[in-house]
Amino acid sequence: MGRIIFVSFGLLVVFLSLSGTGAALNCASGWSGYDQHCYKVFDKPKSWADAEKFCKKQTSGGHLVSFHSSEETDFVVKLVSQTLESQILWMGLSKVWNQCDWGWSNGAKLKYKAWAEESYCVYFSSTKKGWRSRACRLLGHFVCKSPA
């Protein structure tokens, strides 16, 4: 009887210690869990817009990865390092400045556009700290994130 209680207590301790790591999250096969979200690294480079569309199609509520803590960043960087070598990876942050509500001074709607600047999107590196921006049209690997 005492042995059964000891084993049951041991299993409870293991379960509770794993519950914060994503082991108890309901993530699809191939996805990894952390803090109520599921993550997956994709190794086929895409533009920022194509990567975001791809993430939305993968799972309900899916988007390019967003970071809300250094711990989450560390988790994703470790996940990436298990899948890819040093890479540039898109994240879900962008500055699409030319999509503001522009209009001509005579009141006409802006239909023709000839912007000289590009939109810039944010990426992170699996080996370097910090975020950087580059043209959204360039290709990069990416990580999708969705609610668990």
Curated annotation (Swiss-Prot):
Limits of the C-type lectin domain: 34-145
Tissue: Expressed by the venom gland.
Principal location class: secreted
Gene3D superfamilies on file: Mannose-Binding Protein A, subunit A
GO MF assignments: toxin activity
Protein's job: Interferes with one step of hemostasis (modulation of platelet aggregation, or coagulation cascade, for example).
Quaternary organization: Heterodimer; disulfide-linked.
Protein name: Snaclec B4
Organism: Macrovipera lebetinus
